[in-house]
Regions:
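Domain-edge interaction signal
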Residues: 1-157
């Protein structure tokens, strides 16, 4: 299994959220903080299930959840993450869907996040061992994430 470009994962969540917003106007629009939290869960689940990272980018523990520098840099100036979805964004979404293992992970993470506000999502994340044991503004180690998420997956099974 190859490492996915993080942009493709972000775009999968962008397209998914845009569809949800069209179906229900009360749905919260995807935020930068939320997509980074979702990526944290994708990485953790991928490590737990496949023993490899889903993407190569570092995840930092921050006061308000997690940060992924490449995502923050690329999307910081974007007014709305679901505005202006072009064909390239749709193609990234479709590429994730074409990978059954990765698609299963993102769908599981999305199902977990559905109905949770960004505040609830970040509050949960900040009570989890990988975030709590990582000093602020430092990289959350993949090994720490793998150990934590493997235990979660065992509980679910």
């Amino acid at each position: 299994m190859s490492v996915t470009e993080i942009r493709q994962l972000v775009n999968w969540f962008r397209v998914h959220n845009e569809v949800q917003v069209r179906r229900n106007e009360a749905t919260e629009k995807l935020t930068l903080e939320q997509v980074m939290a979702l990526l944290y869960y994708v990485q953790g689940m991928h490590l737990a299930v496949f023993d490899t990272v889903a993407f190569a980018d570092d995840i930092l523990a921050c006061e308000r959840g997690v940060a992924i520098q490449t995502v923050a840099t690329q999307f910081y100036a974007t007014a709305g993450l679901i505005d202006d979805l072009d064909e390239a964004v749709i193609a990234d979404h479709d590429a994730i869907e074409a990978d059954p293992q990765l698609a299963a992970i993102v769908h599981t993470v999305q199902a977990f996040a559905d109905g949770r506000s960004i505040i609830r999502l970040i509050t949960r994340l900040s009570t989890e061992r990988p975030w709590m044991e990582t000093p602020q503004n430092q990289v959350i180690l993949p090994g720490l994430m793998a150990d934590y998420f493997r235990k979660l997956v065992q509980v679910i099974e």
